[in-house]
Structure formats: C-alpha cells, structure tokens
C-alpha cells in the first residue's frame, strides 16, 4: 500500500518493517509493564508457581524480553517463586493456548499470565479459581473474579504526536 500511495504516510503498530519513506512502525516499552505485572504476580502467588503462556520462543526478542522483565519483577518481591513457561509458537491459536494453559494449571500454577492473544489463559484461570494477568485487552470484564491486572496498550499519545508532527 505504501508504494501505491507515496503521498500517504503509513505506520504499523507493533510491527518491524519500514521502507524509510512513507511506511514505519512503532512499539512501546512493554518490558516496563511486564516488570510491574511480575511484581503483582509475585505478591499474589501462594504456591510459588506462576504460569506464563508465551506466543513465541527466543526467535522473537519481544517475548523472551517480556518474560525476563516479568521474572525480574516476580523475583523482586518473591525470590522463592518459579515461573513455568509454555510456548505456543503462535500469536493467536485457541487450541494451543488452551492446551498450554491447561498444562500449566495442572502443574499447580496459581497465577497465570500470557503473551498471546486469546482469552483462554485468563478464562481457564478463573474456572480453576486462580489469579490471572491479561495481555492486550482488559480482562477484568471477562474474568472479574480472577483478574489482578492486564498489560494493555494506550497508543493515544503516539497517535496524537504522529498526526501533529
């Protein structure tokens, strides 16, 4: 599209490609929110087992960076807690995320978080009576009894700046 419309500026949220002319990408510092959500998880686990459903492995730096920041947050308040990661290799796959969540819950994880896009890790956490930390949407509406917090984006400051500059 950018090549077809050279006088229009395109910007892709959470992307990684650019043409150096009229197409760029932008991203936030998700590790900051991951660190804070790790603190929340570390303060709320009773059994010191925290489940993390991850969309990608180390081939995508965003995900392991988020896991590391989350782990540092957990460790800062609860050095005895362990984080168990299950990788789906997909950003959005209901079946894989459900199975990964079930595996972690069956291991005894009493706090669940995610870096993937279906609500399954959170809805299953609520069904099992454990806490959850959502991602990319406010899960407090869908899982009001279990949601501790959610890592979500508010792009309004970027959009305002991009439009006016």
Where are these regions (language model features)?
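A residue-level marker of the well-folded mature domains of exported/periplasmic proteins
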Residues: 1-165
